[in-house]
């Protein structure tokens, strides 16, 4: 990696570290949202650099994961090991518990729980009185994220109103909120997918194995390769194939598609990303295909994304 490229990554790193420290200085009870995906892994590393002496000390705020019950097992194993080894506090909010308590209603055990997790997240934020939540969202991912500020204000119901965003001139952030309001904070807003992978290479960060090429049973559905699992079974007329694939994003098994790939290292993934002409969410996330405004609708309802 050239020195110019490293300098660019260090500038992005410095911007993110500044945002994280600003939130801790202005807000009382922040939390870091962690999915076990590449973006949240980079975000965790940035938080450790900002506040945890580069990872030698536990963070002064907890890590929150919304467990839908439809997660990839490899990601859950990585989540537990990564947080445990660093000594951070992990809070797991369960969608299944929300279903059991009647907070949300599930159409069927194999249906997507993407919409349901919003209620679980909002309940967890309220129960722990968190007033700021760090997320790994990036502006290059999707149009709704492209127009969202670094400090994304949510009302007392956790909802986002795009027309009520505050200006952020010269990296000046206003974190004043009323009781019950929240801020979702996106320190990695200016990263691209390629920046994320290059930062992973620079910092030699460990990732869940699903990010690299492996053989998996999949079915082709609506133009995506979905992994056969306890929540994805072949429909009538669908064939099960064993294919060399990897994942560009981490979401639920029910909505996250794989891509054909032979990339087994960070360097080879970087080469694939450099040649890709389709965004990661556009290629692999069924939850963003329901409508052109699917992500914005979820944000307005209070989603973590």
What are these model-predicted stretches?
Residues 1-305:
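Nucleotide-activated chemistry modules centered on ATP-dependent adenylation/adenylyltransferase
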């Amino acid at each position: 990696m050239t020195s110019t490229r490293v300098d660019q990554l260090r500038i992005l790193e410095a911007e993110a570290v500044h945002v994280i420290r600003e939130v801790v200085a202005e807000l009382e009870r922040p939390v870091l949202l962690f999915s076990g995906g590449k973006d949240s892994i980079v975000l965790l590393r940035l938080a450790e650099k900002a506040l945890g002496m580069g990872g030698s000390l536990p963070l002064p705020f907890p890590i929150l994961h919304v467990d839908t019950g439809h997660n990839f097992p490899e990601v859950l194993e990585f989540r537990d090991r990564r947080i445990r080894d660093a000594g951070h506090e992990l809070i797991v909010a369960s969608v299944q518990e929300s279903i059991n308590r009647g907070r949300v209603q599930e159409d069927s055990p194999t249906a997507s729980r993407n919409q349901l997790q919003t209620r679980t997240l909002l309940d967890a934020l309220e129960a722990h009185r968190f007033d700021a939540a760090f997320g790994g969202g990036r502006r290059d991912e999707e149009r709704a994220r492209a127009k969202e500020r670094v400090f994304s204000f949510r009302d007392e119901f956790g909802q986002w109103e795009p027309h009520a965003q505050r200006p952020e001139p010269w990296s000046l952030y206003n974190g004043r909120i009323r009781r019950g309001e929240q801020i979702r904070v996106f320190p990695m807003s200016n990263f691209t997918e390629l920046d994320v992978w290059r930062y992973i290479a620079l910092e030699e960060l460990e990732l869940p194995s699903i990010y690299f090429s492996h053989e998996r049973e999949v079915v082709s559905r609506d133009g995506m390769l979905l992994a056969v699992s306890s929540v994805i079974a072949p429909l009538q007329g669908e064939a099960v194939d064993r294919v060399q694939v990897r994942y560009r994003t981490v979401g639920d098994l029910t909505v996250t598609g794989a891509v054909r790939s032979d990339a087994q290292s960070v360097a080879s993934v970087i080469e694939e990303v450099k040649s890709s002409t389709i965004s990661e969410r556009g290629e692999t996330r069924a939850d963003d295909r329901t409508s052109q405004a699917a992500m914005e609708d979820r944000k307005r309802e209070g989603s973590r994304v």
